[in-house]
């Protein structure tokens, strides 16, 4: 019996079944959020239910341009994932608010084709990617709160919006409220 050739086959099958990513805590859950025209949908979440990503390199790729690698520390905690639909001729604002104002959260989201869901580490390109996190320095005329917001705009096509709420500086615990406001 020839066992030598079995290992490459097993590795190939594991790669096909698991995908290209193996998350530290297993495959993540992606929570569906039903956005409603001209309303705000609110969902509760917790970083405890999230996973740490092996790599943040996808975010700084020029085809994604989500956030620069100099800001990676703000996304090193657990990530909790959400997905919603963005219909044509609409603007969506997504805001995360920590239950405890001292919890340092970050948010990112990307706009992709309406018929797919792509996890962050598998993202090779997107229509647009937005992120918000704690500022390194004050901005003239602006005051930052613990809330973080991102915004998307659809002109003639519908899109899928993938949202990630992340703990900053390795944070793995913290409850939050996610608000999805859709204007048509």
Locate predicted features.
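Bacterial N-terminal signal peptides that target proteins for export
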Residues: 1-10
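N-terminal leader/pro-regions and domain N-caps
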Residues: 28-49
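Acidic, Ser/Thr/Pro-rich low-complexity intrinsically disordered segments
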Residues: 25-28, 35-37, 55-184
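Bacterial N-terminal signal peptides
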Residues: 9-21
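Generic cytosolic/nucleocytoplasmic N-terminal low-complexity/intrinsically disordered segments
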Residues: 3, 20, 37, 47, ...
